[in-house]
Amino acid sequence: NEQAVIAQLVDNLRRLNYNDALYDIFVVADNCDDNTAQVAREAGALVHERFSDEGKGKGFAMAWMFERLFKMERKYDAVCIFDADNLVHPDFLREMNSRLCNGERIIQGYIDAKNPTDTWVSGVFAISFWIVNHVWSLAKYNMGLSCCLGGTGMCFDTEVLKRYGWRATCLTEDMEFTIQAMMENIPTTWAHDAIIYDEKPLTFMQSWNQRKRWSQGHFDVA
């Protein structure tokens, strides 16, 4: 249920510094019981509604949407994934297109904080992501090592998705797909200038619940 934020993201994506004839904006309204689908349509997105009592969660919704996407008449070179509460830098698609033209097939963008000054919790999250982005992800990319997907701001060559499918459905589907790709000798690369602004938790309890979910997902992948 993302009716409060989805229009802002769709409007943001329509204003990127990229030929709007070369990309489409899809919204997956997964088991929503609010007005997410209607709001997204009114904002200009192509909305696909999914209702299922089995296979709940982001990973299952992505697999479902990819299957529908590949059956469409219009074909796409790549797919980018964003969370509903994100904002995207105007040059995001330009940066990703450059990486794709360079032969990179799975690419993670720079996840920045959308609300670093809201509370001390969101501030700590922002600092931790800034450190990881520079000291971990950028460093690994410069050393020729595979990076890790971050759940949003991800870009995939569609041929990779068609060939291997999307089989990542645990709580941390990003980590799961990163490992699956590495087992096929496909590294995840890093686009330092392809920036996404992600909303961070405001309270300690929100942070606790999110971290607990991530920890469970990482344990499942291991």
Question: Could you describe each region identified by the protein language model?
Answer:
Residues 29-37, 52-54, 87:
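A conserved acidic beta->alpha catalytic loop
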Residues 79:
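Short aromatic/hydrophobic "clamp" motif used to bind/position activated sugar donors
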Residues 169, 178-196:
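Catalytic donor-sugar/metal-binding loop of nucleotide-sugar-dependent glycosyltransferases
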Residues 11-22:
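Short, acidic, metal-binding catalytic loop of nucleotide-sugar glycosyltransferases
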Residues 83-87, 167, 181:
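The conserved acidic donor/metal-binding loop of glycosyltransferases
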Residues 34-35, 82-99:
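Acidic donor-binding/catalytic loop of UDP-sugar-dependent glycosyltransferases
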Residues 1-10, 31:
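Active-site beta-to-alpha loop of glycosyltransferases that engages the nucleotide-sugar donor
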Residues 49-74, 91-171, 208, 212-222:
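Long helical/loop segments within the catalytic core of UDP-sugar-dependent glycosyltransferases
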